[in-house]
Design a protein with these regions (language model features):
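Mature catalytic core of soluble alpha/beta enzymes
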Residues: 2-377
Length: 377
């Protein structure tokens, strides 16, 4: 895939803008949902600039469209050549990971789904992520389900769906949703996956978290001393900011316009990921239907949570558990977060309460003074 770009050199101040984590999760989750949703090529804008002449820190910036969302990065290095290399490397890796996890064309996941019932060889990174998704499904009592694909295809929320499917269609899809039917063989160099006929694997609620962590690791190996990667609201951080302090990440208010912040979390070297149903939904018959589906009822999850934010070094873990906790509701989510030792910020659906894990409470500033703050274990 050719990725046209624009590059230039310009002076810039070392000012750290607030980056907002949101619930948008537009990674195509099924072949039918993805069809026609993305342009054939990503058209990123890149630049390299001296971020701080006195300290000889250079900033590489990247912005483009990939995985159905806006991808951006600010990457810092000690010299201009390394910074320029970071911009190129980031572009290459984004394209590679999109190809790895695509559900379109002859992508490996699409091959597994099209050949349900037989073993299919896959990249071992895919096998590892599917195995991790199965663990989250098991430990969350199926509040997260990597075989949700048939339900996603029926509802198409965020992919053109604007009405409730028939009961018959929902029941038929539900019969195909069962993570225990996924078989994963992680033999090094010979990884493979098998699913039952009619099933399809959907990594839309975990893949971007994995990709964010992978990109951060790749950029560190390529010479980045610091950086911030934003995959449509899923934020992954490389170390601390160039100024040597934590990054400041805003948590979006669920009932407001994009970039309206209700809290700020200070963090370094982790992923900050948010789930909610406020950005992908439709209204029909006087009801609002969100995109996070229940594998038990087949309907959009009924929850008393407005959003869930998780801070974790493992982006895939944060991404998968965000979806699980949101669908589980506040009471079960708080119990699961404590058991799994997850650092969370949970907002109630009425936005009257914000639950914050004790481990991160000193790093969280609540901007909405109307919300009651509860620090939890």
């Amino acid at each position: 895939m050719h990725l046209p770009h624009a590059a230039g050199l310009m002076p810039t101040a070392l000012a750290l803008a607030l980056v907002v984590t949101t619930s948008v999760a537009a990674f195509p989750t099924s072949a039918s949902a993805a069809e026609g949703q993305l342009p054939a090529a990503v058209a990123p804008a890149r630049s390299v600039a001296a971020a701080d002449d006195e300290k000889s820190v250079y900033e590489a910036r990247f912005t483009g469209l990939a995985m159905g969302t806006i991808v951006s990065a600010k990457l810092y290095a000690a010299d201009e050549k390394t910074a320029a290399g970071l911009a190129n490397r980031f572009e290459e890796k984004v394209a590679a990971y999109e190809t790895l996890f695509t559900v379109r064309g002859d992508g490996p996941l699409n091959d597994v789904n099209k050949n349900a019932g037989v073993w299919r060889m896959v990249d071992c990174r895919i096998a590892s992520l599917v195995a991790q998704a199965k663990v989250v499904a098991r430990d969350s009592d199926r509040a997260f389900e990597p075989t949700i694909g048939p339900l996603v295809n029926v509802w198409k929320i965020g992919f053109g769906g604007h009405s409730r499917p028939s009961d018959a269609d929902i029941k038929a899809a539900l019969r195909k949703v069962d993570y225990t039917k996924i078989a994963v063989d992680e033999t090094p160099g010979a990884c493979r996956i098998r699913i039952d006929p009619g099933q399809s694997i959907d990594l839309g609620a975990i893949a971007k978290g994995w990709i964010g962590t992978a990109l951060a690791s790749d950029m560190k190996e390529a010479g980045a001393t610091s950086g911030i990667i934003d995959l449509g609201g899923n934020v992954s951080l490389i170390g601390s900011s160039p100024a040597g302090v934590d990054w400041r990440i805003g948590v979006q208010r669920p009932d407001a316009e994009r970039n309206t912040v209700m809290a700020v979390v200070e963090a370094s070297g982790v992923s900050v990921i948010t789930s909610g149903d406020y950005e992908r939904k439709f209204e029909s018959g006087g009801r609002t239907y969100g995109h996070i589906l229940s594998p038990v009822t087949g309907e959009p999850a009924t929850t008393d949570l407005g959003s869930v934010t998780i801070i974790d070094a493992d982006g895939a873990r944060a991404d998968g558990w965000c979806t699980a906790l949101f669908a589980a509701g506040s009471e079960k989510a708080l119990a699961l977060a404590q058991r799994e030792k997850l650092a969370v910020i949970l907002a109630s659906s009425d936005l009257k309460t914000l639950w914050v894990s004790r481990s991160i409470a000193p790093k969280v500033t609540v901007l909405d003074k109307s919300m009651k703050i509860q620090v939890v274990p």
